[in-house]
C-alpha cells in the first residue's frame, strides 16, 4: 500500500472518503460486468467449439463425396459444373452492443442465378448433388462460426481490460485510499488530543 501525498485535513479526509466510496462502487460494477462477460464468453466458446467440429466434419465428408462424384464424371464435365456460379450471396454486417462490447451480427441474402446454366440433374449425379446440397447448408454454419469467433475475440479483449481495471481498484487504488484515510484520521486524532491537552493546561 502507498499512502497518498495529501495534507491531513478534514477537507481532504472527506474528499478521500468520497473517492473511496466511488472506487468501491465502481469495483463492484466492474466485477459484475466481468463475471457476466465471462458467463457469456464461456457459452460462446462452447458454441464455437461445437460449430467448428460440425464444419470440419461436414468439410471432410464433403471432400470425400466430391472425390467419389468426380471419379464418376470426366474432368471437363466437372469443371463445367463449377465454372458458373449458381447462387449470388450478399453479406450484411450489423453491430450489436453486448456489455459495452460492439460485436458483429452477420446476415446473408442468397439468390439463385444462372437458371439456364449447364448444371442439371442430367449432367450431374447423386453424389455431386449431395456435394452441392451440403455446401449450401454449410454456408450458414460458416457464417455463424465467423460471427462467433470474432465475438469471442472481442469479448476476450474486453474481459482482459475489465480484469485489469478490477485488479487496479482492488489491489492499488482502494487500499491506497483506505491507508491514506486511516493515516489522516490518526493525525486528526493526535491534533485533537494535543489541542485538548493545551486547553487543559490553560485552565
UniProtKB/Swiss-Prot annotation:
Superkingdom of the source species: Bacteria
Stretches assigned to coiled coil: none
Record GO biological process: proton motive force-driven plasma membrane ATP synthesis
Gene3D superfamilies (UniProt xref): 1.10.287.3240
GO MF terms held by the record: ATP binding; proton-transporting ATP synthase activity, rotational mechanism; proton-transporting ATPase activity, rotational mechanism
Keywords tagged on the record: ATP synthesis, Hydrogen ion transport, Ion transport, Transport
NCBIfam families registered for this protein in UniProt: PRK00373.1-5, V_ATPase_subD
Its job: Produces ATP from ADP in the presence of a proton gradient across the membrane.
Family (UniProt): Belongs to the V-ATPase D subunit family.
HAMAP family with a match to the protein in the record: ATP_synth_D_arch
Protein's name according to its UniProt entry: V-type ATP synthase subunit D
Naturally occurring in which organism (per UniProt): Streptococcus pneumoniae serotype 4 (strain ATCC BAA-334 / TIGR4)
Source taxonomy: Bacteria, Bacillati, Bacillota, Bacilli, Lactobacillales
Name of the gene this protein is made from: atpD
Amino acid at each position: 500500500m502507498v499512502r497518498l501525498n495529501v495534507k491531513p485535513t478534514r477537507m481532504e479526509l472527506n474528499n478521500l472518503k468520497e473517492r473511496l466510496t466511488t472506487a468501491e462502487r465502481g469495483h463492484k460494477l466492474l466485477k459484475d460486468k466481468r463475471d457476466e462477460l465471462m458467463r457469456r464468453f464461456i457459452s460462446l466458446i462452447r458454441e464455437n467449439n461445437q460449430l467448428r467440429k460440425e464444419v470440419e466434419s461436414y468439410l471432410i465428408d464433403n471432400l470425400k463425396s466430391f472425390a467419389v462424384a468426380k471419379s464418376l464424371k470426366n474432368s471437363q464435365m466437372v469443371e463445367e459444373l463449377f465454372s458458373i456460379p449458381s447462387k449470388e450471396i450478399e453479406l450484411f454486417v450489423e453491430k450489436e452492443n453486448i456489455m459495452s462490447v460492439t460485436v458483429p451480427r452477420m446476415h446473408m441474402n442468397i439468390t439463385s442465378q444462372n437458371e439456364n446454366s449447364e448444371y442439371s440433374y442430367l449432367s450431374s449425379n447423386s453424389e455431386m448433388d449431395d456435394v452441392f446440397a451440403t455446401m449450401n447448408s454449410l454456408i450458414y454454419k460458416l457464417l455463424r462460426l465467423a460471427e462467433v469467433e470474432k465475438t469471442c475475440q472481442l469479448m476476450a479483449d474486453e474481459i482482459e481490460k475489465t480484469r485489469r481495471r478490477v485488479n487496479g481498484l482492488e489491489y492499488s487504488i482502494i487500499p491506497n485510499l483506505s491507508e491514506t484515510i486511516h493515516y489522516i484520521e490518526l493525525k486528526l486524532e493526535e491534533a485533537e488530543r494535543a489541542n485538548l491537552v493545551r486547553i487543559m493546561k490553560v485552565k
